[in-house]
Amino acid sequence: MIIGRKEEIAELDKLYHSDRPEFVAIYGRRRVGKTFLIKQALKDRITFQHTGVSPVDQDNDRNRLKTQLESFYYALLNQGLEGYKMPKSWLEAFFLLEQLLQDQDNGERQVIFIDELPWMDTPRSGFLPAFENFWNGWCSGRDNIMLVVCGSATSWILSNLSRSKGGLYGRLTAEIKLSPFTLKECEEYFEHANIQMSQYDILQSYMVFGGIPYYMGYFQKGLSFEQNADKILFGNRPRL
């Protein structure tokens, strides 16, 4: 069950059922539930999905590009691609994605979900021009394509997609900024999770954790707010 997000779910469903190619960007702070929203709203309707690899601990630009391309290639293989070697560039990688989608095209809507897209744009990788070419040269000419991208690097999404002055200028057909839960939605979340919380404790949780579902997911039944907060913030494996 998804708490709240009614407008966002309705928007995604409308876009899914449109009769034109759709290019959707979803952004918001980390742990706000972007990936969960997309996977629930488009459950069993995603044709291809991939998540960019975190740049943490990747020591140089060449290794970052190689890691991203390898991860993308393995996602293609896992989702049906056959007969192609690992790509050496992003242009080649998106060409392989086109081949996979064409092979699986039965006339129904094809949803492409790329999570943490900004991580894939490593320095001197040529990612953005290749991604632009993928949308402008292939996706935009197919009425059954729905490309959904998201990322926590809001500044990247805004500058390269929403406010792009380059090849993706004006290409987004929809953008969704996902906000934290409201106080009311926090209350609904705890009720659904069968966690007993007083109104005061719900307010405290909202002030401390900001309505971020990820942190609320670590609340345990039978513990007071103070005990839960202590475990989440200062336990052996703190979540903040």
Regions found by a protein language model. Name each.
Residues M1-L240:
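Phosphate-binding site recognition
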